[in-house]
Amino acid sequence: MQRIAVLTSGGDAPGMNAAVRAVVRCGLKAGLTVFAIRRGFEGLLEGRFEELSDYSVSGLMYAGGSAIECARCPEMLEPHGPEAAADILKRREIDGLITIGGDGTFRGALKIAECGIPIIGIPGTIDNDIPGTERTIGFDTACDTLSWVIQRLRDTAEAHHRTFIVEAMGRHSGWLALYGGLAGGADVILVPEVPWKPEDALATIRRRMREGRTFHLILIAEGAGRAIDLVSWLQEHTSGELEIRASIPGHIQRGGSPTTLDRILASRMGQHAVSALLEGRTSIMIGEACGRLVEVSLAEATDGCRMIDHELYQLALTV
């Protein structure tokens, strides 16, 4: 193996740059030529390859986003997309590809692997919903950001006796809402994995009002419903008794300098991915379990969605 490439695909996540940095520097140390593919699979199909040096990744440890850029690529869902991608990699004499992203990225990677390309996946998504790993790059930073948002909304909610409905990212799982809400002190956390009714949220608010609370914070994962819809329902069923606002942090949750935990996780996974390629272990994702790195087949990593820890959810309901 002499030439490898790395790409970031799908939604960006804090720590992707740290992973790219580790891949490049570990690859160069092993005597490899390392290329970045700009804008993920879209850039792969367009031939946007760029050789990287040790200096070119200097400073990436601290940077949010992705210096080599991300994109979603619908063509990878079509039969011709992965075949064309594999042909381009072969013509470029790329001996191995490292993909950093979430479930969509790994589905594309698996299809390219089936065309004969050695591939390693590194989980980079703020959703933390990839089977086979307990943590994904970017999740810790996004949790910090979301809890930061909730803490500041609490200040104004308390000052004005308001109820805030905060909408967190998470289409299929509620990991971000659960961790961010628990750390931020949300009164109610609504996630896709747990059926809920608006009446339950209102009952919690009324109970807290009887206890003397004058403000309330409800966190809802986007996959569990829309904040604006819950605001409308509560306004309709409280007859103006509550002053209610919706707050949608949106893509703020994706941004910012990665936390120390994300930087270290990304660096470890990047190094492990290069080692696995060199040792011939491919069509796998690098995951983490009990603090140790593990190797999981891409087939397993794309098999469904990792659901929340229900014991932790019960704790969130209690405290």
Give short role names for the model-derived ranges.
Residues 3-10, 66-71, 96-99, 164-167, ...:
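Short glycine-rich or small-residue beta-strand-to-loop segments that form or flank ligand, phosphate
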Residues 44-99, 105, 137-148:
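Glycine-rich oxoanion-binding loops at beta->alpha junctions
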Residues 18-23, 104-117, 177:
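Short Gly/Thr/Asp-enriched flexible loops that form oxyanion-binding sites at enzyme active sites
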Residues 35, 113-140, 145, 190-197, ...:
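Short, acidic/small-residue loops that bind anionic groups at enzyme active sites
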Residues 1-45:
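N-terminal phosphate-binding or glycine-rich loops at protein starts, especially the Walker A/P-loop
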Residues 284-319:
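Phosphate-binding loop/pocket of nucleotide- and phosphate-handling active sites
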Residues 99-101, 107, 111, 139-246:
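Accessory alpha-helical/coil subdomains and C-terminal extensions
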